Swiss-Prot record:
Ion transport listed as a keyword: no
Keywords (A to Z) from UniProt: Cytoplasm, GTP-binding, Hydrolase, Magnesium, Metal-binding, Nucleotide-binding, Potassium, tRNA processing
Pfam families per record: MMR_HSR1, MnmE_helical, TrmE_N
Binding-site residues, GTP: 226-231, 245-251, 270-273, 335-338, 358-360
Binding positions (K(+)): N226, T245, I247, T250
Free-text comment on the cofactor: Binds 1 potassium ion per subunit.
The enzyme's E.C. designation: 3.6.-.-
Source lineage: Bacteria, Pseudomonadati, Pseudomonadota, Gammaproteobacteria, Enterobacterales
Organism annotation: Escherichia coli O1:K1 / APEC
Compartment list: Cytoplasm
Binding site for (6S)-5-formyl-5,6,7,8-tetrahydrofolate: R23, E80, K120, K454
Protein name: tRNA modification GTPase MnmE
A Gene Ontology BP annotation from the UniProt entry: tRNA methylation
Cellular compartments per GO CC: cytosol
Amino acid sequence: MSDNDTIVAQATPPGRGGVGILRISGLKAREVAETVLGKLPKPRYADYLPFKDADGSVLDQGIALWFPGPNSFTGEDVLELQGHGGPVILDLLLKRILTIPGLRIARPGEFSERAFLNDKLDLAQAEAIADLIDASSEQAARSALNSLQGAFSARVNHLVEALTHLRIYVEAAIDFPDEEIDFLSDGKIEAQLNNVIADLDAVRAEARQGSLLREGMKVVIAGRPNAGKSSLLNALAGREAAIVTDIAGTTRDVLREHIHIDGMPLHIIDTAGLREASDEVERIGIERAWQEIEQADRVLFMVDGTTTDAVDPAEIWPEFIARLPAKLPITVVRNKADITGETLGMSEVNGHALIRLSARTGEGVDVLRNHLKQSMGFDTNMEGGFLARRRHLQALEQAAEHLQQGKAQLLGAWAGELLAEELRLAQQNLSEITGEFTSDDLLGRIFSSFCIGK
């Protein structure tokens, strides 16, 4: 198998459909056109032609599109054959094409990989193709399209360019220490470094939102038995996803629901009531509940309002609060307001959001939905946003760490070489996002997750 091979793959999903598309890319795409179509179509025009077998019989007829390189998606010669979407017809046509020497089935993501290698896309844009296909909401699709059009890459490239200028300035200070210009006392290096750090912090914040939009925020409902956790899951899901009874401990295992609030994806997780386990099955359920809590982006601390008037979570259940991971956001949900007569709505107590509602009647649940949406940071128009992956967040975090270490060098003993090295490492981390600096292993992992025809 060679990267110089001409590749072919079905670009439409398997199964029956009105249209089925085969995509060919590489040096022999021209030969495929002349062999199967009997002619080379006019570039970038839709040509209605018969698709012929080796003996001249017609296998199908449809639209042929010819994109000579480098003006194509992959940067190579590309031919697309759009015929009828029956699996038998497409299979016959594919077999016909593969009889031509030098052609093979494409690997998953190989078309996008070739586009990246031929500088048609950077790595973040290539990943955005897969994210656009996998988008589970309108907002995710819009943000993926923004990434595909270069919104994320432009922000990263701006940071890389700023670091390039800063490195030039720092290395000049190192290489010409006896010059009359004092590169340190004029404050330019510190000012430029602070500007880069501020810009990077802004990109990190937006990338975290983009990651939540892509992967969804994990919200765990936790509390004592019979507090109404399963009722709240059902209210948020809009269906009877969990069994609800008056018997404490009905929920023994983790229940998951994937929902959207105004296009924002959330993974809502109902857990077993937390208490001293009465049997082995309940003990396992409680252990799993804590595992989910430790991995959560937010915890809804469910409180039965008929059992306590307290609103401060540390007063309601100090042992529970003490065991929670540090910095894990908590929303206190006082349930059964239809019984207690409490005023519905949201307030704040000791830095925690407090929401009074009735999971059984649904009163106040909309307030919780809006709160969850706002806690993701998407309470404003996000049309200019972009999607981000975990590897992007990791690269941004590492770059931020190197810049902070570099700033410490600048404000400390002025170890110029060490500052220059921290700037270089930060620049390298950022370049990994767009693929300017990356490994073959990383490329393989990224593109192998794509569809075959992409």
